[in-house]
Amino acid sequence: MKKRRQGPINKRVDFLSNKVNKYSIRKFTVGTASILVGATLMFGAADNEAKAAEDNQLESASKEEQKGSRDNENSKLNQVDLDNGSHSSEKTTNVNNATEVKKVEAPTTSDVSKPKANEAVVTNESTKPKTTEAPTVNEESIAETPKTSTTQQDSTEKNNPSLKDNLNSSSTTSKESKTDEHSTKQAQMSTNKSNLDTNDSPTQSEKTSSQANNDSTDNQSAPSKQLDSKPSEQKVYKTKFNDEPTQDVEHTTTKLKTPSVSTDSSVNDKQDYTRSAVASLGVDSNETEAITNAVRDNLDLKAASREQINEAIIAEALKKDFSNPDYGVDTPLALNRSQSKNSPHKSASPRMNLMSLAAEPNSGKNVNDKVKITNPTLSLNKSNNHANNVIWPTSNEQFNLKANYELDDSIKEGDTFTIKYGQYIRPGGLELPAIKTQLRSKDGSIVANGVYDKTTNTTTYTFTNYVDQYQNITGSFDLIATPKRETAIKDNQNYPMEVTIANEVVKKDFIVDYGNKKDNTTTAAVANVDNVNNKHNEVVYLNQNNQNPKYAKYFSTVKNGEFIPGEVKVYEVTDTNAMVDSFNPDLNSSNVKDVTSQFAPKVSADGTRVDINFARSMANGKKYIVTQAVRPTGTGNVYTEYWLTRDGTTNTNDFYRGTKSTTVTYLNGSSTAQGDNPTYSLGDYVWLDKNKNGVQDDDEKGLAGVYVTLKDSNNRELQRVTTDQSGHYQFDNLQNGTYTVEFAIPDNYTPSPANNSTNDAIDSDGERDGTRKVVVAKGTINNADNMTVDTGFYLTPKYNVGDYVWEDTNKDGIQDDNEKGISGVKVTLKNKNGDTIGTTTTDSNGKYEFTGLENGDYTIEFETPEGYTPTKQNSGSDEGKDSNGTKTTVTVKDADNKTIDSGFYKPTYNLGDYVWEDTNKDGIQDDSEKGISGVKVTLKDKNGNAIGTTTTDASGHYQFKGLENGSYTVEFETPSGYTPTKANSGQDITVDSNGITTTGIINGADNLTIDSGFYKTPKYSVGDYVWEDTNKDGIQDDNEKGISGVKVTLKDEKGNIISTTTTDENGKYQFDNLDSGNYIIHFEKPEGMTQTTANSGNDDEKDADGEDVRVTITDHDDFSIDNGYFDDDSDSDSDADSDSDSDSDSDADSDSDADSDSDADSDSDSDSDSDADSDSDSDSDSDSDSDSDADSDSDSDSDSDADSDSDSDSDSDSDSDSDSDSDSDSDSDSDSDSDSDSDSDSDSDADSDSDADSDSDSDSDSDADSDSDSDSDSDADSDSDSDSDSDSDSDSDADSDSDSDSDSDSDSDSDSDSDSDSDSDSDADSDSDSDSDSDSDSDSDSDSDSDSDSDSDADSDADSDSDADSDSDADSDSDSDSDSDADSDSDSDSDSDSDSDSDSDSDSDSDSDSDSDSDSDADSDSDSDSDSDSDSDSDADSDSDSDSDSDADSDSDSDSDSDADSDSDSDSDSDADSDSDSDSDSDSDSDSDADSDSDSDSDSDSDSDSDSDSDSDSDSDSDSDSDSDSDSDSDSDSDSDSDSDSDSDSDSDSDSDSDSDSDSDSDSDSDSDSDSDSDSDSDSDSDSDSDSDSDSDSDSDSDSDSDSDSDSDSDSDSDSDSDSDADSDSDSDSDSDADSDSDSDSDSDSDSDSDSDSDSDSDSDSDSDSDSDSDSDSDSDSDSDSDSDSDKNAKDKLPDTGANEDHDSKGTLLGTLFAGLGALLLGRRRKKDNKEK
């Protein structure tokens, strides 16, 4: 808000003697809104006492206007009723102490927890007179104690902004915040003053805290404008100057060196240091010894530190040097100072040269321990008739805080001391405390700047450079304080008032009485006076006495002021505790409610009246608080009345009323609070005027550490600062007027010419003031800042002489660019009389310089460095480049002379030349031949002693320097891989090779002809081929192929191994980088193979050389060393009765053509309870295009509890067209924990012919990890009747790490005709990439009943890239009861493109994982009746042609109990665009508990309409923890022909991990009746052409209870385009607790009518890359008993079945290799009839 203006102060603002030892404070008109800010701080006592001078003192009397005395008012107001109320106004007379203004010191920034009250410490404001108005209402301002008479006692301010907008709205002016910035900057500046500075400028701390000014209202009702705070702030510079660099003040000191000392130095060294330091200060020479002796006499030099010596020097130098009135203090200070008889004190002058010493120690420290406080007292300034220990704060009563102090002489500029106020007391009176204060001496000099911090309730004083000029400083102060209304809130309560001055505590108890008349209808008080914003904040309590008027109107009037619109607020009191006695209500608490808008206070046009119509609001007992703000408008007392009547008038005849009035009175009534006047800043810049033109140029920097003093028009010092690092200074809080600015002239500097430019902002304004060591400039402030008062100094001219001492390598006496300086050369400077005046040595660059020379003639002498000879002198015409010899004369004339240089040379020579690569081996350097770097060259003297070594540089050059005449030997070390070329081949010694050892002669000149050439030593290779000699003739035939992986060892002729390798996939091997010589090559025979005949042919490159071959290399490669092997034959007749449980993991890549005609009748009943905990990491990129047509009718009852957190990013493109009709009932309980770690790298090539007739009954548990490359022809005729019922409860913990690199090539033709009646449970987890043309005609009737309880925790890391295009028609009728517990953590990145067209009617439970690469022709005719439980994990890559005719009748009842614990991490990025239209009628009852923690980044949109009532009860007893880490690199190529007739009864448990590339022709005719429960996990990549005609009638009952806890992290990138038509009729009752985070984008058309009575538990993980042509017509009823007698010629090592290690028995279970049926864990079969929701 706008400040009230006041013109310049034309009266003197000093003290007039009033009576002995007292000073009355002159009163100034500061405006009616001002309040007595506080008494000024004074020093000393009586005439010798330095007192804080307060410029403006306003005394306000606080009056309580009331018709009677306090007691009378009580009774009277209690009797008032609304009908005939009486108006009473209490007046409090002005307090006498207002006349005698106490020096108010702003409390320091110490730690008082209270809010920052803005203390207006009177002491500080020299510029602005402090007004001492203490508005009677409670005013918290520290310095002033204006007296206001208020009917009600002042309301205290609470810690929180209790008076909210009205009381807290005031804020400090922007100028103050600006001050704050400057304060911090000044602090910075002061620390960087030149060497002389004491580090902290006086205003430093003041600036730092100045921001507190801005929140003066923080916890107080309203911030008060501090009358003196602005002047007290001394800004050293403006913010804009922060970035400017600091001028180095070292220029002000002489160049003479001062010895360095420490505490341990000797007394003599310390005395020398003292003498040198004193001399460097520029003290008069006749005083130097006196100061040095004084330091010696007054200090114990033996124990003294450098810091103590510096302090002693400063003290003594001050005594000697500060004798001229540089600061306008023409008489000794009124402070008590010790007068040294040797150095009487006169006025002080600044010393730039002292700053280096003064700045060293104690910069900016708290010196409370060095401020001695005596006679501290806390007394009551009583102005009313009451007990002496009672204070009436609202009647303008305050505390007086007095003390004397004495400053230790070690205190320096920037040091601080504090005054900390206790919990219940704060500085100031009714006014809000001023933030800025000053301590002044009697003559007006600023001793310290104070800053009050409301948050800590502390004033911190920062000493100015005043303390550096004087010693034995003593003083006293008298401060005003008041109870802190935020904490001392109750009337008639005893509070301890405590203040800590420096380290001295003064404490006294007082009873506080605010005079809150609780029996009055209207009670009011001035809460505080805010000088910053020029307003009085008033608080009114209404209906505090429960008068409950039926109709009431409130109005208030003011004289000599006006109400501020918008600052009248009404609060409804919800708790009477809000009406605190201190009149400092917390308006932010829940005890009050802002209802201003409800009553809409009205302010009159002239601002002198406020009206609020409460109507009937008080009739029910409501109480209200009104806050209002008054801005003084005149020079008289501000008088406010507060009325509560029935009609809003003062008519006393008809209505009773409640009234109250307050008056803020000012002594003399003519002054205005200084804080209301606008203030400005004055300042600018002191700079180093290098070009002495009196104008600031861009490259000229500021001078730090220059003392600047501000004086008023009466020559009274107002403020003083020191320029900051960038040379800036600033004085703040100045009113309009003309001021004098004095700049102390730094030593060794001269003032620049004044007013040399028309631009006043950049010229120099200072002019020397006679003989005084200051320059003076005038600055005028006229309603704006004046930032143009600046001055320049330049260094008093001194000149330099010097230049350069260099090594004149070419001895021409001229400095060349490549010639370098010589360091350490002694140079002597003599005057014209020949006296030595300086010596120096050249630096590392050969430079030297003598500085600080006056005009005159000098002689410079150069000492010849050892080993050098002076070069020619004055050889050139360029004086700056020639040599002046060892002695020369120089004349200095108003300029530096940098031409005096001297050259020397060493009489030594160089030897060297070049080492090159002689590519054409002719011993002559050709232009195209390049140097060889890094060749070691050794130099020896004539006695053969090595005197130097070096290596050739990047270009092949080398050189030895500094050699005297003589004969030398040069030896060149042959570089690795090189051979020396011919020596001395040509006539030109500069281009021929001198060989590896040669002699070089130096005779008065360099010899740069010694060179040597080398050429690269040739390297050769040996190797060839290891092949399979199928016809065993020892000769490589074109159709015979290489054998990979054969180990080949290279040895030297002594048999030491040099290297080993293995043949590549083609059987090739090679050893490189061999020198000529004899070698041995050894071939290690591959397992299962026999060495072929050696050296059987005439062609060495075609025959076999045997296993150990001796080879001689002579200047050429040898690629004829090869060897051949052929396969062993085995004939085995085995009779095996096997009970095997097989778990096979195969990887098959099959290209099959299948034409199948199957007739299947299956009845399966499966009860599956699966608990899967899978953590998978898969990176799949799938592109699937699916077009599906689903007609499903499902009846499911599901109770699922799923907690899934999935983050999947899938990009899938699927087109599926499916038509399925399935009826399945599955109950699966599986618990598998597998942790396998397999690293297999096998390469086997087996050619076996086996004719096996075996009758085997085997109970085997096999774990096979095989990599087989088999080429077999088998003809098998098997009749097997196997009835296997496996109830397996497996707990497998496999930790496998798989890194597989497989090459599979399969080509298969399959023709099968099958007629099957199967009752199967299939759990299939398949990942298929199929490109199939299938024409299938199948007739299948399946009824499957499966009870599977699976608990799987899978940890798989899969990276799949699949393309699937599926078109499926699905008609499914399922009734599923599933209870699954799956914990899967998958991270999959899949990009799949699948196009599948399948028509399936299946009730299967299959879990197959197959990876197979087979090329087989199978013709099998089998009749089997098998009841098998198979868990097959196969990964098949097969290219098979199969013609099978099978008739299968299978009845399978599977109860599998598997617990799989898999941890998979899948990274899948899927983009699914699915368009589904689903009509589903499903009835599902499922009870699933799924805890799935998957991290999937999926972008999917799913639109699904399902009604599922599924009750799945899963009995899962399986524990599976699978962590697989497998590193398999297999390359298998198998061609097998197998004819087998087997009769086998097998119960097998096999865990097989096979990677097979088989090319087999199999003709099998099987008739099988199988009751199979197959759990197959297959990974197949199949490209199949299938022509199948199938008729499938499937009736399946599926009761599945799955509990799935899945933690998957999948990042899948799939493009899915799914167009599905689903007709589904589902009835679902699901109780699911699902916490799923999924984002799916699916556009599906599904028309599904599924009533699925299908008990199928299908967990299929298949990765199939199959290209198959399958024509299958199978009718199988098989119970086979197989007796096989096999004779095999196997190329590859067969899988290790765990039987034994004999290689001859490894071909027995060829069928087991492909089956891979593993560890299907069977549990109890359970079907739940009662559905569980």
Curated annotation (Swiss-Prot):
Region listing for Disordered, in residue ranges: 51-269, 332-351, 862-890, 1085-1708
Stretches assigned to coiled coil: none
Domain CNA-B as annotated: residue spans: 679-797, 798-907, 908-1018, 1019-1129
Propeptide: 1698-1733
Recorded family membership: Belongs to the serine-aspartate repeat-containing protein (SDr) family.
A Pfam family reported for this protein in Swiss-Prot or TrEMBL: YSIRK_signal
Region described as Ligand binding A region: spans on this chain: 46-678
CC terms in the record's Gene Ontology section: extracellular region
Compartment list: Secreted, Cell wall
Keyword Secreted tagged: yes
Domain of life: Bacteria
Region Type I collagen binding region, annotated ranges: 679-1129
Placement of sequence motif LPXTG sorting signal: 1694-1698
Keyword Plastid recorded: no
Primary role: Binds to type I collagen via alpha-2(I) or alpha-1(I) chains, although its affinity for the alpha-1(I) chain is significantly higher. Involved in bacterial adherence to transcutaneous drivelines from explanted ventricular assist devices.
Compositional bias annotation for Basic and acidic residues: 61-74, 175-184, 227-253, 1107-1119, 1685-1706
Keywords for the protein's UniProt record, in alphabetical order: Cell wall, Peptidoglycan-anchor, Repeat, Secreted, Signal, Virulence
Protein name (record): Serine-aspartate repeat-containing protein F
Topological relation to the membrane, as annotated: Peptidoglycan-anchor
Principal place of residence: secreted
SUPFAM superfamilies per UniProt: Bacterial adhesins (SSF49401), Hypothetical protein PA1324 (SSF117074)
Composition skew (Polar residues), residue ranges: 85-99, 146-168, 186-226, 255-266, 336-346
Feature: compositional bias, Acidic residues: 1125-1684
Sequence positions bearing Pentaglycyl murein peptidoglycan amidated threonine: T1697
